[in-house]
């Protein structure tokens, strides 16, 4: 009867809990079918195909192999749904000018001669102070650099901007070092002047889903095989004694934590009791407490 309740709507499903990844990815699944949507029979190739607006929002790889191919998708790693129901993806803002402030100007490369300092000079603290004094309250043109500010963009806004990928060359202060960079202009790949870049990808795994990001050396795989790999990872039965993989991509820890199937301790301590139902961890009490230590009990998920 529980199963019946969950299948009362076409878009409601009983949660897939084969392993932590299956649960996480099931919660991030997207469908073009259901009430007000398409039907398998009516959907042609056009609808199922990967579109440039999917970048950073819907994974181009993880989709079922059967009749649902391209109709059921998965959220990309950093994508989010905004208050209006649109998918957004984050980008780092690129700046080409800064306010005449010594702190802001330090380590920036001048785009034009200012205060007797030649264009192309990387400013040190003294030079930055000199320029700041000369240009007080004005904007100083610098070579493009990637800030740590993030903007979430939907596909419509992104289409009007010029986006560079996360693999572009930057120096240790995030200045762009190449005069020409590979970028997406209106969704199409081009090589363009660095000065024209508006945003840079947050990460190289921005356009793919969590399951796909778990595949090591994904860039060497054929797309069809990567699709099979992403889908089959969700079907793997968990080990009784789990081990860390010898080769990983670095996202394993985050995926496991966010799946909701892992019991996390509030703080480190000594395990003083453990069985199939619970774990008790003893940690130092905070300063000023009456007790010397605190025992915290964590119930385990047991079936």
Language-model regions: role of each:
Residues 1-303:
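Intrinsically disordered, low-complexity regulatory segments
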